[in-house]
């Protein structure tokens, strides 16, 4: 618990130091920073040395993720910042065409101590493409991490993903995507099941089918906040080779006032060589 408090305090402090609120969506600020100007110059050069890092098709989706190095040098390191470009089409229709992401489009006040991370394709459902992206001080865990959701209706949403730096982090991945699917209109049941199967055991799948997709949220998160909350996680020190108890915590956006929690049991499995991996949710309860 003390570790979580320290991590949450660090995240809130970082957000406070970086100023301005977390921006959800694609709207960009009007203030021009030095790295924005450099990034603009790179853009005007037609993305010199553009590198395709992901070119993937799934069902009727086609996703291309590209990177290009900018002229912005990271302070204190012999490294340069980058731009990530995301292009997504569905059924042959282009939904996002070289959608540009920089560290300042993730969070407007990130300075040149931070470097945009690599982008990772997390999940593709019937409704949404999920990509993770962050900005960190090189060779450290200090920075901000986000889940980007590109929906089939052409809308984009950005979710802050606070990192606990322990076995519980993937729980937040699951909750962000599962919650996003629950907020679709109409909700696509197959997409919910896909996310659950990617992160849960057969026992957890059975629980969701029996108790319903909203059963893994505190009642007030559903009724009062309509699932529009900040989600975080923490591990406990009480675990064995079979199970690892964790908690998921729900907060209002940009607030440290806890709404409620849920208990999460992770199921362990032995690694190929040694150790135990806790990478599946087995049950979520009050």
What are these regions (language model features)?
Residues 164-215:
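Core segments of small alpha/beta cavity-forming domains
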Residues 27-29:
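Bacterial signal peptide processing site
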Residues 154-160, 255-286:
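Short beta-strand edge/turn micro-motifs at domain boundaries
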Residues 2-14:
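Bacterial N-terminal signal peptides that target proteins for export
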Residues 59-66, 71-74, 127-136:
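Short beta-strand elements that form the blades of beta-propeller/WD-repeat-like
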Residues 93-112:
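Surface-exposed loop and turn segments in beta-propeller and other repeat-based domains
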Residues 120-121, 210-256:
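Surface-exposed, charged secondary-structure patches
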Residues 22-25:
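C-terminal motif of bacterial Sec signal peptides marking the signal peptidase cleavage site
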